[in-house]
Amino acid sequence: MITLKEALKYSKEELENLKKELNEKAKKEKKIGAYIEQFLDKDLSVSGEGVPVAIKDNISVKGWELTSASKILQGYIAPYDASVIVNLKANGFSPFGRCNMDEFAMGSSTASSYYGKTLNPLNFERVPGGSSGGSAAAVAGGLALASLGSDTGGSVRQPAAFCGCVGFKPSYGRVSRYGLASYSSSLDQIGVLTQNVEDAAILYDAIAGYDKMDSTSANIEFIKTAPNLNANKKLKIAVIENYVNDADSEVKNALLKTIDMLKANGHEIVYKNLLDSKFDIAAYYIIATAEASTNLSRYDGVRYGKRSENIQNLKEMYVNTRSEGFGEEVKRRILLGTFVLSSGYYDAYYIKAQKARAFIKAKYEEILQDCDLIFMPVTPTTAFKFDTQKSPIQTYLEDVYTISVNLAGLGGISVPVAKDKEGLNISAQLICKAYDEQTLLDGALSLEQMIKN
């Protein structure tokens, strides 16, 4: 598979042939489920000119159906382009293909999609991760050069780690959220999934920057990262020792070898500890579900999306539309969020969660005052099997090493470093100071080149 960097040099005719080739391959590999049905039958001319980039089904592309992989949004056609799509088109790229996802980005396996599950290209019995599992599977399976996803608590980095590609979540506010179907507004961030670190920098440069359409967009100077990539920069890296030690034995051993390689290549390694991750999980799922319960209140059958046909009055329209339209996991999170925001529980749960979030952010900032980057696992294990019976709580633990990065609003990247005995991917996670994506990508490129060599 050619890289983004190579494809940007293609002629118009070569790009048209590339899109036809990708579309045919996607149809042939339909069983992977990386794309939802509406892409496979789409007239390729509507994608426009430019290097093709696959798009998660919660990012608005004018004229395309946008469903967030949910029954309740079937038939909704996006009336405008998200800011990231506008930026893509302005920088020589074109949206190409709707990627499958967990419904409303709530999940870690891409098994809750209305369209059916996505398979992991490395092993069809394993989950691709989530919620951007379709975006990761498309890149890892050679069905896309690169893709856009969204990351609320690890939804770009975790599937990238499970599928074996690079997953990069920029700092909160660095990439506009205008046109992203919201899950948790204070945590959501659009990110990129690519074949390598340089492509991640190129695609990030194309979509990043201040946007007046997004009130949470960071109005600070943005300097392109790809032209300034430097894999030879020697960095001070803080290894989160308790997280590495708590990971599965194969993941732990692979990360310890990676740390030794970083030392051997001249990077300074120091060891730090973070809080027990149970505090991250508690704070995250209170804040995220609280915000989700309000964000998803707009899906009521009145303005857009699918309305229940089994209605006699206004109350039945609301109740039946939402009961029939939302999947089980989405309902669970709406109920949890409504509960923690309710009278009598707001102070006991939501306010405490916000205090915990501030404490988590301060701990990261304390470590990064003295270090360039943080190193830790992306996931505690490699990709698990679909038939593994996991309770909702066990599933939430899949994001145990990624959610705190969103709570702190920092940038993070997942880089493949090894394979386990079954050939499944193991990745390392690097984390940077807020808005210091250049250092993050430099460190990731250094790590990637070490592994390849």
Swiss-Prot record:
Keywords: ATP-binding, Ligase, Nucleotide-binding, Protein biosynthesis
Active site: 56 (charge relay system), 131 (charge relay system), 155 (acyl-ester intermediate)
Listed Pfam families: Amidase
Gene Ontology, cellular component aspect: glutamyl-tRNA(Gln) amidotransferase complex
PROSITE patterns assigned to the protein according to its UniProt record, in alphabetical order: AMIDASES
A molecular function GO annotation: glutaminyl-tRNA synthase (glutamine-hydrolyzing) activity
The protein's Enzyme Commission number: 6.3.5.7
GO biological process, one term: translation
Catalysed reactions, semicolon-separated: L-glutamyl-tRNA(Gln) + L-glutamine + ATP + H2O = L-glutaminyl-tRNA(Gln) + L-glutamate + ADP + phosphate + H(+)
SUPFAM superfamilies the record matches: Amidase signature (AS) enzymes
ATP-binding is among the record's keywords: yes
Subunit and interaction comment: Heterotrimer of A, B and C subunits.
HAMAP family, per database record: GatA
Record family assignment: Belongs to the amidase family. GatA subfamily.
Role of this protein: Allows the formation of correctly charged Gln-tRNA(Gln) through the transamidation of misacylated Glu-tRNA(Gln) in organisms which lack glutaminyl-tRNA synthetase. The reaction takes place in the presence of glutamine and ATP through an activated gamma-phospho-Glu-tRNA(Gln).
Identification of the protein by name: Glutamyl-tRNA(Gln) amidotransferase subunit A
Organism per entry: Campylobacter jejuni (strain RM1221)
